[in-house]
């Protein structure tokens, strides 16, 4: 196998493409990079003679068919909802596919046909999902192999701004897809704690935070992710008493964000009338009761008492939410308008660096004694292109592609990297790129 097709040349593809182009001469690979923006694809290629850039439209079925026909292995860096379109074509033509995204129901439905045709559909090969699975499974297998019984598992991940570039009152900047941040946590959160099922509705999520100290970076708050329980079966820990997966933010973020949640400003289910004419102040006022004798600020603090807190109020004020400035978005949902406002203030600046933090905490029993084992990854990005997020999404995906191209992966059908023959080589090589977990253990 020598021909690799990469569909999508967005932010997350930087390290993936650089890795594959860097290894192309040694392995005799040719790489085609397609994106709706030819400029983006050509920019990622950078004139490298081992690749070609082209304009790609996922909705052009003939083009997709022709490109998949050319390839031995395809890698989809397109938005997750587009992966099944690529996957179906790959299965039809008997070509392997890799993605960094969660296994959707549509992807799962292709498992039997893919396996029959000898096709690998490798998914969840990024950071979250991806490195989280691989590093957790390495710890789980290690504890099991010495006879331990796992009783608790808490796994937290955060994509944040590096401390040296943290210069706003939210202690946060968008290092990844802003839309996902605005919509985070919607639905009901479900986890298991000390044998009890716990449910947190969206309107209470950001007031149900926990704090963790992660040296040398200090204190973080965590809000739980939506469905932690599905990982019991995936990881083979069905009898576990506690399993919680969460998202990390700097302390103080959740209380301020909760103001928007309580008002309904993160709703993405409807369009606001005349949204193109709304100022930021009018947008906020749309969610407050009519009272001609009160200012918007006064109404907000009456309706949402938390906004009376000076620190929270200053966060909101810094965002510009009280300004008489036009947002300028037609036919937009509240979530889209809020995202636009936040992107103006929380985008990465030219010299910014991000930081990725991931921590697993396992409680287990061995020989009648109780232990706790922590495994922590902290990685600071190089710049706004070679971010920690791009490195941890793209590099494991690239390593997996190399393994598949060189015959080291014999799994077929829908595959996740939760077996030692997959996660060990990927995690070991990631350490060469600075993606390394530090472990500590203590007896309880």
Which residues does each predicted region cover?
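Glycine-rich Rossmann-fold phosphate-binding loop(s) that bind the pyrophosphate
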Residues: 9-10
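Rossmann-fold NAD(P)-binding glycine/threonine-rich loop
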Residues: 101-123
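C-terminal catalytic/substrate-binding lobe primarily of soluble NAD(P)-dependent oxidoreductases
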Residues: 142-444
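ADP-ribose/adenylate-binding Rossmann-like module
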Residues: 89-107
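NAD(P)-binding Rossmann-fold cofactor-contacting core
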Residues: 28-45
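Conserved Rossmann-fold cofactor-binding substructure of NAD(P)-dependent oxidoreductases
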Residues: 58-69
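Rossmann-fold cofactor-recognition segment
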Residues: 48-60
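N-terminal Rossmann-fold NAD(P) dinucleotide-binding loop
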Residues: 13-14
